[in-house]
């Protein structure tokens, strides 16, 4: 799977989780329904999901502050910005990837490193240690 397809899978898993479904069931069903995904793909997707869930409260407060919806895409976007991932490789708009960046996402991704630290605050300390 390409990185954008892995990201799109993580987005759909997070959306189901935010709808109140059990995470273990979601992951199990996703694995059964996507047999083409290799073990490294499944591991990458799980890592994205669990990394985001560890800091969900902080990411949620950033989204609320910016008056943005709280959904899988928004959480994955913040994760990608926080880890300085190449957003154009992730939000490709191609067949299996998430749609291209919105205007808000493009503007938000331009913030400086200092602003990222200010926005994310405590999460930086959490992830460093």
How would you describe each model-predicted region?
Residues 1-129:
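Class I Rossmann-like S-adenosyl-L-methionine
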